[in-house]
């Protein structure tokens, strides 16, 4: 099983990637779970939080629900079914090979993540990966990967989670959880579906692999 988290930054550009993932899953008999980011909906929550100083718990709850909203959008434009429980997802993915997970029910009922803006949908996708016993997560976003500095830096092909320090396209908690869960991740530009397909195939392309173990 593969997990592909499609960030909210790709909301308006996600359709080709969704189509490519759906075709790949069916043609290769591979199971793919898509986890949505919070997108512009989450940005509205941030704005309200900043203006009204609402509690961390409420911000956390609302931001997670935003992932469901983007997930519903991806489900419609990608013609992919969406589910809000692991039971339904696991059952249906055996037939469909691909599904979108609307994660709020799972994440809020288990309350497994810290209530903080330090944890975004990137890190939440790792929690889902742990629940599904998946060892790798693909983070499809609007940048080519992780750079050694920004702006004007060099794209890194591979990096240890221990070495990620600021100015990255993943949240600050992501490398910590990656090490804790002993997982690997790929950061890739989702506007180029062929790059995501190459990760699924184990082929080299333009992306960054983040290794969540002590040594690469």
Swiss-Prot record:
Catalytic activity: [5-(aminomethyl)-3-furyl]methyl phosphate + ATP = [5-(aminomethyl)furan-3-yl]methyl diphosphate + ADP
Cofactors demanded by this protein: Mg(2+)
Alphabetical list of CDD domains matching this protein: AAK_UC
Record has Nucleotide-binding as a keyword: yes
Superkingdom assignment: Archaea
Keywords linked to the UniProt accession: ATP-binding, Kinase, Magnesium, Nucleotide-binding, Transferase
Residues bound to ATP: 5-9, 39, 142, 147-152, 166
InterPro entries assigned to the protein according to its UniProt record, in alphabetical order: AceGlu_kinase-like_sf, Asp/Glu/Uridylate_kinase, Furan-3-ylmethyl_P_kinase, MfnE
Pfam families recorded: AA_kinase (PF00696)
Regulation: Inhibited by EDTA.
Activity versus pH, per record: Optimum pH is 7.0.
GO molecular function: ATP binding; kinase activity
First-tier enzyme category under EC: transferase
EC number(s) recorded for this UniProt protein: 2.7.4.31
Associated pathway: Cofactor biosynthesis; methanofuran biosynthesis
Subunit record text: Homotrimer.
Record function comment: Catalyzes the formation of 5-(aminomethyl)-3-furanmethanol diphosphate (F1-PP) from 5-(aminomethyl)-3-furanmethanol phosphate (F1-P) and ATP. In vitro, can also act as an adenylate kinase that catalyzes the transfer of a phosphoryl group from ATP to AMP, generating two molecules of ADP.
Protein family membership: Belongs to the MfnE family.
UniProt-recorded name of the protein: [5-(aminomethyl)furan-3-yl]methyl phosphate kinase
